[in-house]
């Protein structure tokens, strides 16, 4: 019997994961699990380059358009739900494909998330109220006092991370750091990681053209439709936050579009830095489809 294998197809934004993922899934007659933390939201289609209705017809997808913007969701929830879906899918397929560029979500499945206590609604509301009334800087100062170790490594510009760490400190009386064991979990399937990469100039050109295409497809209208929710963490996202600056009257539209391109390029560099630390990834150019399929076939057998 062939071992269960999860193919993990990763790479920076704009590299060309979508079409190749469809072709790999069709080749193995299997389903795709998205590991894009923004494609989860039904309202965010254009700005997240979510699979089109035609692409969704070609291959069954999971974790695309399943949430509303106001839904709270975490990488820990994602891990639990994906593991449950994988258990079902592996009863029908010996190979399943996971693809996307959200580094934390990929790691949640490949390595696992630490068992951190579930935050109660009262604590969550308290800290969200503090964030709204006192601002992020005050919360960062509080985190420095309660968990100086995590304060040194957390992205202090990311309110969701800062708030979550404080929630755990408030609720348990312990540091958030004390729950972060970062021990890799054993998985009941084999994991094969394929990384896609391009020459930087080639990737940047693709990113720039993709942003232009998103604008042609109606990104401005999509951003306008969710503008009322602009304070949500789910919309602190490249492509939306820049358009909001235009809608606020701070930037003109051409400048906002250039900032989307620039911030997308910066994000692609961050993704590559994260992925390059993983020695399990086998790297290919997206056009090396034949080589990728040969490698997968040999590795799965």
Curated annotation (Swiss-Prot):
- The residues that hold ATP are 11-18
Molecular function GO terms recorded: ATP binding; tRNA dimethylallyltransferase activity
Q: Which UniProt keywords apply?
A: ATP-binding, Magnesium, Nucleotide-binding, Transferase, tRNA processing
The yes or no answer to whether the keyword Protein biosynthesis is present is: no
Enzyme Commission number(s) of this protein: 2.5.1.75
Site (described: Interaction with substrate tRNA): 102, 124
The entry's substrate-binding residues are: 13-18
- Spell out the Gene3D superfamilies in the cross-references: 1.10.20.140, P-loop containing nucleotide triphosphate hydrolases
Region annotation (Interaction with substrate tRNA) ranges: 36-39
Q: Which InterPro entries match?
A: Dimethylallyltransferase (IPR039657), IPT (IPR018022), P-loop_NTPase (IPR027417)
What function does this protein fulfil?
Answer: Catalyzes the transfer of a dimethylallyl group onto the adenine at position 37 in tRNAs that read codons beginning with uridine, leading to the formation of N6-(dimethylallyl)adenosine (i(6)A).
Q: Family per UniProt?
A: Belongs to the IPP transferase family.
Fill in the subunit field for this protein.
Monomer.
Which protein are we looking at?
tRNA dimethylallyltransferase 1
Which source organism does the UniProt entry give?
Bacteroides fragilis (strain ATCC 25285 / DSM 2151 / CCUG 4856 / JCM 11019 / LMG 10263 / NCTC 9343 / Onslow / VPI 2553 / EN-2)
Which lineage is the organism of this entry classified under, starting from the top rank? Bacteria, Pseudomonadati, Bacteroidota, Bacteroidia, Bacteroidales
* Gene expressing this chain: miaA1
């Amino acid at each position: 019997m062939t071992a269960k294998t999860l193919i993990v197809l990763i790479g920076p934004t704009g590299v060309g994961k979508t079409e190749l993922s469809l072709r790999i899934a069709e080749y193995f007659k299997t389903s795709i699990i998205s590991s894009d933390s923004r494609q989860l939201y039904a309202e965010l289609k254009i700005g997240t380059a979510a699979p089109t209705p035609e692409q969704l017809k070609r291959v069954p997808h999971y974790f695309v358009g399943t949430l509303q913007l106001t839904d709270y969701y975490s990488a820990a929830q994602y891990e639990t739900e994906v593991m449950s879906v994988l258990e079902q899918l592996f009863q029908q397929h010996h190979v399943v494909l996971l693809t996307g560029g959200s580094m934390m979500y990929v790691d949640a499945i490949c390595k696992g998330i630490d068992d951190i206590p579930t935050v109660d609604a009262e604590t969550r509301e308290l800290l969200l109220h503090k964030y709204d009334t006192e601002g992020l800087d005050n919360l960062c100062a509080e985190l420095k006092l309660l968990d100086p170790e995590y304060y040194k490594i957390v992205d202090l510009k990311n309110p969701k991370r800062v708030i979550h760490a404080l929630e755990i400190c408030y609720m348990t009386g312990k540091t958030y750091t004390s729950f972060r064991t970062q021990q890799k979990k054993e998985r009941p399937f084999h994991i094969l990681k394929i990384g896609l990469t391009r020459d930087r100039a080639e990737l940047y050109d693709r990113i720039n053209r993709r942003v232009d295409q998103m604008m042609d497809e109606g990104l401005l209208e999509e951003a306008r439709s969710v503008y009322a929710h602009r304070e949500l963490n789910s919309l602190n996202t490249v492509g939306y936050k820049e358009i909001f600056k235009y809608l606020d009257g701070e930037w003109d539209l051409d400048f906002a579009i250039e900032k989307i391109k620039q911030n997308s390029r910066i994000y692609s560099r961050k993704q590559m830095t994260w992925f390059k630390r993983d020695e399990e990834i086998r790297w290919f150019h997206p056009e090396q489809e034949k080589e990728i399929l040969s490698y997968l076939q040999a590795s799965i057998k």
